[in-house]
A protein has these predicted regions:
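Short aromatic/hydrophobic-glycine micro-motifs
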Residues: 40-41, 69
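Conserved BB-loop
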Residues: 42-57
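Short, conserved beta-strand edge motifs with alternating hydrophobic and charged residues
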Residues: 24, 44-47, 72-75
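Short active-site oxyanion
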Residues: 17-21, 65-70
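Acidic, PIN/NYN-like endoribonuclease modules and their adjacent C-terminal/linker elements
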Residues: 2-14, 19, 24-25, 29-40, ...
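Acidic, metal-binding active-site segment of PIN/NYN-like and related structure-specific nucleases
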Residues: 68-83
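Acidic, metal-associated active-site segment
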Residues: 55-69, 124
Length: 153
């Protein structure tokens, strides 16, 4: 098995410059498709990887940071700063809406107001490790009443 960069090859070049997210098993597959097709995000979805399907939350938290991805979930446990210290993350986005369409509306706002607000131009694959993540070291809980303000570190 090679390195992650060598295994992804050309795909990594296609999605560089796009928001890079790590989506846990609590997020519906339809929403993952929306992230990829409508928002053009670079998505690692744990349910598509047998070795990650049953990993504990702490492992997902660690892997998201190691892979330089913002963790996206519907699991509010990630908001517990004692269990998941913000400074040890690449950023956490916790979503909540009663229906999937509401989640899509929230993701469009997050894409526009948070992830792409200060977006850098397309980044070379080798520079991904040096590019700061939009929510690095912070957590954001978005829901239908979200006023657009970020949760401070």
């Amino acid at each position: 098995m090679g390195t992650l960069a060598s295994e992804l090859g050309g795909y990594a070049e296609q999605v560089s410059g796009q928001p890079r997210v790590y989506v846990d098993a609590n997020v519906p597959a339809g929403l993952v498709s929306f992230m990829r097709q409508a928002l053009h995000w670079d998505v690692l979805f744990v349910l598509e990887h047998d070795e990650l399907r049953r990993a504990p939350d702490g492992e997902h938290y660690r892997l998201a940071r190691q892979l330089r991805r913002t963790l996206i979930t519907q699991d509010r446990d990630y908001l517990d700063d004692r269990k998941f210290p913000p400074e040890q993350s690449g950023g956490v986005l916790v979503l909540w809406a009663p229906v999937e369409k509401g989640l899509m509306v929230l993701l469009k706002r997050v894409d526009r107001e948070v992830l792409r607000r200060n977006a850098l131009p397309q980044t070379a694959v080798d520079e991904i490790a040096e590019t700061p993540l939009p929510l690095e070291g912070r957590k954001l809980h978005v829901h239908i009443d979200w006023d657009g303000e970020r949760i401070a570190p």
